[in-house]
Amino acid sequence: MIALIQRAQQASVSVAGETTGEIGPGLLILLGVEKGDTPESASKLADKVLGYRIFGDENDKMNLNVQQAGGSVLVVSQFTLAADTKKGMRPGFSAGAAPAEAEKLYDYFAACCREKGATTETGRFAADMKVSLINDGPVTFWLQV
């Protein structure tokens, strides 16, 4: 399971002109589910994302996690993160989980974030989404479990 996390001043996601999720300061989490991922890997990745210290403390040192910084998270499904880009000029998606399984694990990941106390908004799985982001930094990390 892959999370591309971006520190945001604000972020939102919409489907067909309707906003489905919106946050102020926090993290935009683009989530890719791979074959072999499990609820345990989703929970482990949620722990890692929520605990990752990429927000500035009183000395402007990256020392606070999203919850310590008072931020929220916006989780958006992104199957393209599981793409194989090693050969050719077209990505391959055979490493991605089947859509039904990926949706269950995406929902479970978001539920884990909520259960761990994070204010959590989401996109809509497998929809054609428009994502808006004001990136803070920019600060972007690729996390994988």
Curated annotation (Swiss-Prot):
Motif (Gly-cisPro motif, important for rejection of L-amino acids): 137-138
Keyword Chaperone: no
Enzyme class: hydrolase
Record-level Gene Ontology MF annotations: D-tyrosyl-tRNA(Tyr) deacylase activity; Gly-tRNA(Ala) deacylase activity; Ser(Gly)-tRNA(Ala) hydrolase activity; tRNA binding
Subcellular location field: Cytoplasm
Annotated EC: 3.1.1.96
UniProt keyword terms in alphabetical order: Cytoplasm, Hydrolase, RNA-binding, tRNA-binding
A GO biological process held by the record: D-amino acid catabolic process
GO cellular component, one term: cytoplasm
Reaction(s) catalysed by this chain's protein: glycyl-tRNA(Ala) + H2O = tRNA(Ala) + glycine + H(+); a D-aminoacyl-tRNA + H2O = a tRNA + a D-alpha-amino acid + H(+)
Quaternary structure (record): Homodimer.
Record HAMAP family: Deacylase_Dtd
Family recorded in the similarity comment: Belongs to the DTD family.
Record remark: domains: A Gly-cisPro motif from one monomer fits into the active site of the other monomer to allow specific chiral rejection of L-amino acids.
Protein function: An aminoacyl-tRNA editing enzyme that deacylates mischarged D-aminoacyl-tRNAs. Also deacylates mischarged glycyl-tRNA(Ala), protecting cells against glycine mischarging by AlaRS. Acts via tRNA-based rather than protein-based catalysis; rejects L-amino acids rather than detecting D-amino acids in the active site. By recycling D-aminoacyl-tRNA to D-amino acids and free tRNA molecules, this enzyme counteracts the toxicity associated with the formation of D-aminoacyl-tRNA entities in vivo and helps enforce protein L-homochirality.
Protein name: D-aminoacyl-tRNA deacylase
Organism of derivation: Erwinia tasmaniensis (strain DSM 17950 / CFBP 7177 / CIP 109463 / NCPPB 4357 / Et1/99)
Species lineage: Bacteria, Pseudomonadati, Pseudomonadota, Gammaproteobacteria, Enterobacterales
